[in-house]
């Protein structure tokens, strides 16, 4: 007899910022058990699925998750009890129907995704398969190129940088293991450079350094210096990726680069700034270079820069097929950031990736700034065929857990493993 869902139990835990989040434990009738812990973001798109919080100012500043936990235990659990866990799409659709809203605001995406991921993880364990093989099929053997955050700014750090993330991509590495070596050596080189220049080497939410630099340009200069100091060739071995998170400094139609003192800019002027940077630095990817509602700006942005680099939509698209389809039709990007908790189920996330593939777009599987030790996204990245993964710096164990899981997967795959796009 095939195993069925026997119990579903949620509880509140804490993420990497000490903020409450949801953990779900799901047990099958064959004794298999699996858990899923859900992350949360600091910079969130206004069209994301709703992360349900309690709103009680007397507890965790209103950020408690007891409502979401209760929704799992009292609403979702009775509805999914007795169902077969490999019916992932059916279970996800059932939870969407139980919620009954367009953005999962009644039950909460944090509640629904916790169950969705736990169902997949339990089904894989029951089948005796690694999660990546269960979700993607036996032929999936491609490891993603990591986008590794080494300098933090914006909402992720208290620094003078307007832009949220400055990342490195080990594009010239022959394997994921070597990519991690390239990255860790560059990270340590940057740390020594910052120390020598008298900067603090404390880190931000995602593990990147957060020094008090004079400008966004200085951040890129330091990264190039670190790549070279580590013995690598900028652009050949290691490239740069940016996530300005431009919505965070966009006010009344103007981009205000106030932290770095670079003044106010229009959408066109921001695109021109990026164009100059691409000519000056080995930048291969820009995510959220403009604000989440600046669709006209993004069309120009992609028309000007899209032949040279990857233009990634995050807040603009929020892992939602409706917005991704619009962006494909309007040529507003050429890649999508994929966040499971932006849309709220495994099934809908897979559908978003299939739409990207159909359009010939790239995709980046992403963490959130408030993470947990859960490694679901690492397996998910391999299951979806590699692409790219963005899961923070080579620092802080909630980030390293994902990288170490990918190293384990590459080792298990042996000679069958492939790396990169």
From Swiss-Prot:
EC number: 4.2.1.11
Domain of life: Bacteria
Reactions catalysed: (2R)-2-phosphoglycerate = phosphoenolpyruvate + H2O
GO BP field: glycolytic process
PROSITE patterns tied to this protein: ENOLASE
Positions bound to Mg(2+): 243, 287, 314
Any one annotated GO CC term: extracellular region
Keyword entries, A-Z: Cytoplasm, Glycolysis, Lyase, Magnesium, Metal-binding, Secreted
MF (Gene Ontology): magnesium ion binding; phosphopyruvate hydratase activity
Name of the top EC class for this enzyme: lyase
Leader peptide range in chain numbering: none
Keyword Metal-binding: yes
CDD domains: enolase
Cellular location(s): Cytoplasm; Secreted; Cell surface
Residues annotated as catalytic: 206 (proton donor), 339 (proton acceptor)
Cofactor-binding details, from the entry: Binds a second Mg(2+) ion via substrate during catalysis.
Pathway: Carbohydrate degradation; glycolysis; pyruvate from D-glyceraldehyde 3-phosphate: step 4/5
Keyword GTP-binding annotated: no
Family: Belongs to the enolase family.
Function recorded in the entry: Catalyzes the reversible conversion of 2-phosphoglycerate (2-PG) into phosphoenolpyruvate (PEP). It is essential for the degradation of carbohydrates via glycolysis.
Protein's recorded name: Enolase 1
Organism encoding this protein: Methylococcus capsulatus (strain ATCC 33009 / NCIMB 11132 / Bath)
Gene it is expressed from: eno1
């Amino acid at each position: 007899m095939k195993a069925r869902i026997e119990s579903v139990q949620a509880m509140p835990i804490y993420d990497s910022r000490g903020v409450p989040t949801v953990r779900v434990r799901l047990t099958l009738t064959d004794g298999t058990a699996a858990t899923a812990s859900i992350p949360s973001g600091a910079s969130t798109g206004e069209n994301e699925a709703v992360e349900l919080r309690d709103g009680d100012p007397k507890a965790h500043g209103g950020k408690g998750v007891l409502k979401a936990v209760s929704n799992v235990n009292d609403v979702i659990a009775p509805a999914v009890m007795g169902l077969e866990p490999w019916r992932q799409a059916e279970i996800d659709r059932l939870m969407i129907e139980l919620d009954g809203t367009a953005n999962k605001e009644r039950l909460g995406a944090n509640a629904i995704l916790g169950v969705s991921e736990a169902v997949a993880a339990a089904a894989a364990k029951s089948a005796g398969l690694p999660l990546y093989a269960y979700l993607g099929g036996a032929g999936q053997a491609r490891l993603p190129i990591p986008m590794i955050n080494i300098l933090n700014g914006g909402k992720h750090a208290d620094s003078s940088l307007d832009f949220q993330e400055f990342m490195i991509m080990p594009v010239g590495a022959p394997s994921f293991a070597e990519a991690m070596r390239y990255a860790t050596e560059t990270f340590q080189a940057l740390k020594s450079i910052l120390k020598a220049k008298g900067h603090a080497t404390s880190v931000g939410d995602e593990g990147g350094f957060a020094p008090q630099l004079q400008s966004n340009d200085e951040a890129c200069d330091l990264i190039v210096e670190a790549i070279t100091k580590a013995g690598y060739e900028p652009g050949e071995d290691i490239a740069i990726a940016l996530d300005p998170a431009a919505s965070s400094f966009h006010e009344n139609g103007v981009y205000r680069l106030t932290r770095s003192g670079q003044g106010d800019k229009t959408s066109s002027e921001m695109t021109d700034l990026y164009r100059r940077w691409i000519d000056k630095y080995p930048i291969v990817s820009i995510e959220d270079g403009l604000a989440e509602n600046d669709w006209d700006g993004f069309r120009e942005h992609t028309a000007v820069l899209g032949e040279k680099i990857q233009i990634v939509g995050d807040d603009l698209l929020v892992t939602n097929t409706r917005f991704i389809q619009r962006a494909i039709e309007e040529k507003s990007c050429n890649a999508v950031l994929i966040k499971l908790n932006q849309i709220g189920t495994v099934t809908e996330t897979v559908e978003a990736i299939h739409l990207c593939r159909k359009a010939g777009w790239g995709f980046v599987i992403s963490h959130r700034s408030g993470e947990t030790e859960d490694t679901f996204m690492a397996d998910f990245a391999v299951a979806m065929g590699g692409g790219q993964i963005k899961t923070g710096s080579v620092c802080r164990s909630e980030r390293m857990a994902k990288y170490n899981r990918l190293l384990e997967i590459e080792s298990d795959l042996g000679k069958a493993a492939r790396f990169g796009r």
